[in-house]
Amino acid sequence: MNTFSQVWVFSDTPSRLPELMNGAQALANQINTFVLNDADGAQAIQLGANHVWKLNGKPDDRMIEDYAGVMADTIRQHGADGLVLLPNTRRGKLLAAKLGYRLKVAVSNDASTVSVQDGKATVKHMVYGGLAIGEERIATPYAVLTISSGTFDAAQPDASRTGETHTVEWQAPAVAITRTATQARQSNSVDLDKARLVVSVGRGIGSKENIALAEQLCKAIGAELACSRPVAENEKWMEHERYVGISNLMLKPELYLAVGISGQIQHMVGANASQTIFAINKDKNAPIFQYADYGIVGDAVKILPALIAALAR
């Protein structure tokens, strides 16, 4: 048996739902999708859900993951085995842990490939900080998986599809976190997962002010701007949402232009699926050149203006 009888899907991030739904179609015969509102339910049906389960009644001061109890009860009531697919977001991983505990089944995070062999899920994901790929065969009847971005292609909506809609009512857990305040933060409005062309900067760009050169290059070629983890986490030059690497974005663009990035493995696992990698680095021995299809050895601050000028001609 190379598919499960059913799969359960939930995404706290709407943009990740089409990808998870496509994976669900490949892995199971029946797709159940938990949603938070009617609009998401309609989208889920168009993406292939046979049954939509609307989570309803959560107080505003409670967290989404507090639905774990009623979600686990619903899953348990409708089948003895199957898959649960969640995005590998922070909330997705927290919910996965809660579901795994309540269902008493195995949880595997950051899956990069998923298959079914003899009725059991087989999962591959990065281990040892991206230095190797580990394979796990899940022995429990259910497997709760968080899926890395880009593992599956996005499902295409079909307005002619139909499905059944159900309601799952809120039940307060015995122990829970209560939200006392919410503070908005500036977040990345660009969906880098879908970008065809990406210019990514590392600390080799020299300063936050020099990132303007990379932005000009992006404008010249129609690319989106990304960065390495040190640029976002250590230097605070760019938003967290834009850094590429094993613990964040895993990209597959047509072109990945790395500017001042050394090319450590933890970064490259997020970029080495790119069709073409172009590197600019002043260190001729930088690891990035082992991955690059094309490279320029030199100071990015001098090379970028020349490159932008050449593109303008």
Curated annotation (Swiss-Prot):
Quote the Gene3D superfamilies the UniProt record gives: HUPs, TPP-binding domain
| Gene Ontology BP annotations | carnitine metabolic process; fatty acid beta-oxidation using acyl-CoA dehydrogenase
User: Which of this chain's residues are annotated to bind FAD?
Assistant: 255-283
Cell membrane keyword on record = no
Annotated pathway, please? Amine and polyamine metabolism; carnitine metabolism
Which keywords, in A-to-Z order, does the entry hold? Electron transport, FAD, Flavoprotein, Transport
Q: Please give the Pfam families that the UniProt record associates with this protein.
A: ETF, ETF_alpha
GO MF, one term, reads: flavin adenine dinucleotide binding
Q: What is said about its interaction partners and assembly?
A: Heterodimer of FixA and FixB.
Q: What does this protein do?
A: Required for anaerobic carnitine reduction. May bring reductant to CaiA.
Q: Which family does it belong to?
A: Belongs to the ETF alpha-subunit/FixB family.
Q: What is this protein called?
A: Protein FixB
> Which gene name does the record give?
fixB
